[in-house]
């Protein structure tokens, strides 16, 4: 049965700024208060989408959130008109305004966890929006995320949508950034790989000491139950707490998987041999041949992996059966990482090609190629049922670039967030975007 993996990339929102909001994310914190360029950021993301589409990969787009989020500010006690709410927040609690203005929804790997129909009990594609409860600025995303996903995948014969898990630390869920799937072919039953940082209820599991573990085992298990996954098709693994403390805040900063291949750092997991053996066994029972490519720490240190985002890459299957690794420019700028990649593609392994993209605006906030996309494996009939307005084409690319040129600023500092005009600019832009993408009314300001 013919099936495809479609990458739905997050469109960078008009309020893209460097607020330094993400404790545990080294790049985010180190670039705090820098001046951003939302127009450039959006165009860098669109250029990646267009390039992959032109290479023959299925590509979609996921709309950004409406920011500043005045409803969130009202819930924190700011009152008056929207303009008055923003002015008061800027005067009394600038960190809250910065949080409610974040464009972090661009990193759609955190939008949701997705299980394809070949894996689920009812034969539908399942989506669970991530609660992202570890960070306030991201915890306010999931209601809009759910509405946007429902507008994109709106045929309930093929798609099932679940609300985010309870917004408490015991069920901290960061979505697909801690989830990947292995399979022989995208339409075959596969093995879903959930990676957690700690257990909420079992003290036998170790935990990081410096930075928080954002994903719990219990959240992973809950999502697997919601999606109707069988035990034979699920593997749970704990991320190494030591690498979380080195800035590996999601598993997609230290490993990436696709098809039958896991590309990972030597220090990515606890009990690595046991984890790999279980993946090999379970994928083998489903007709696949699991293969792990381990990057030794003496060739690429964890620090280099974090700085370059080597593993926050896209691993894509080409038509000839080989794989392409999509990496950020920072990998080419790191001699140790680039030497490793040169060696990797020269070997007789599955990864034969590396493609480099300039994603500096996103990277400075701590998000590489993998952060920017949500993978959805779809059968032909399911792909035909997706809202066609969100599938990338040459025409849509041109339309979105023109839309960005009309509505986005090329400079945004923290003080600019206090400008009530920014709110009006963003709402005007997003109101137009929902028409371009044929989403209907998905934003709170459209529903009020």
Curated annotation (Swiss-Prot):
**Which pathway does it take part in?**
Amino-acid degradation; L-arginine degradation via AST pathway; L-glutamate and succinate from L-arginine: step 2/5
Protein keywords: Arginine metabolism, Hydrolase
Under the heading InterPro entries, the entry gives: AstB_sf, SuccinylArg_d-Hdrlase_AstB
List the catalysed reactions.
N(2)-succinyl-L-arginine + 2 H2O + 2 H(+) = N(2)-succinyl-L-ornithine + 2 NH4(+) + CO2
Single GO BP term: arginine catabolic process
Positions with a binding annotation for substrate: 19-28, 110, 137-138, 214, 252, 365
Q: Which Pfam families match?
A: AstB
| One term of GO molecular function | N-succinylarginine dihydrolase activity
Instruction: Name the Enzyme Commission number(s) assigned to this protein.
Output: 3.5.3.23
Q: Which residues does UniProt mark as catalytic?
A: 174, 250, 371
Q: Which SUPFAM superfamilies match?
A: Pentein
According to the record's subunit comment, the protein's assembly and interactions are:
Homodimer.
Explain the purpose of this protein. Answer: Catalyzes the hydrolysis of N(2)-succinylarginine into N(2)-succinylornithine, ammonia and CO(2).
The entry's family comment says: Belongs to the succinylarginine dihydrolase family.
Q: What is this protein called?
A: N-succinylarginine dihydrolase
